[in-house]
Amino acid sequence: IKVPIYLMTGFLESGKTSFLNFTIQQDYFHTDGKTLLILCEEGEEEYDPAILEANNTVVEIVENEEDFTTDRLVAMDILHQPERVIIEYNGMWLVSNFEKMQLPKGWGVEQQITCVDGSTFQMYMANMKSIFMDMIKNTDMVIFNRCKQDDPLPTYRRGIKVANQRAEVIFEDEEGELDDIFQDEMPFDMDAPVIEILPEDYGIWFVDAMDHPENYDGKTVRFKARVMKPRGMGSKFFV
């Protein structure tokens, strides 16, 4: 990939612009070359032209999906010759349509990040589940913002992991990232006759089992693992 694409997805007012406004100004995201920011929808929050100019970022706006074409992207590439591209994708456009597109030569998706408004997540899941699932099936990271501690966050996480096991899931409230959200509620049933540990929950279970072994005393736990049998070990033993 010569020109990396950072694809931002999420429904309108999910926090995409806020996230990008913050990220563009960070030292770790700085680059000497030009950044092309393609906006496919406009929410309430806008970009500060001074910040964009200071970070060598140019903006192209594509309002209609039928105008979001390979030819249009090639024209942008020729005009701006960007070192990287950020796409703030329209939440009502299927991400799978973008994935099928032929991109300009040298362009390729480096990372996809999906923003979710925690306060409206359940409503969108009830009314636009197919669009949301299409949005997250190949994303690298899902950021839930505007969360509250009493929201069913483990349930939200499981819903994401069912659709995309490799996605990193982050929860934030107004103060920043939430820590230890599984401290009081594990993402598996502790009262089940057999506690089923999904592969994506293994890390959470392992840490909890090391910290609180008494919680699992006398219980049956099922998880996927690899059995190793070193040489010299007795027939009744394995690692």
Predicted region positions:
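Nucleotide-state-sensitive switch-loop elements of NTP-binding domains
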Residues: 1-111, 115-122
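OB-fold and OB-like single-stranded nucleic-acid-recognition modules
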Residues: 138-239
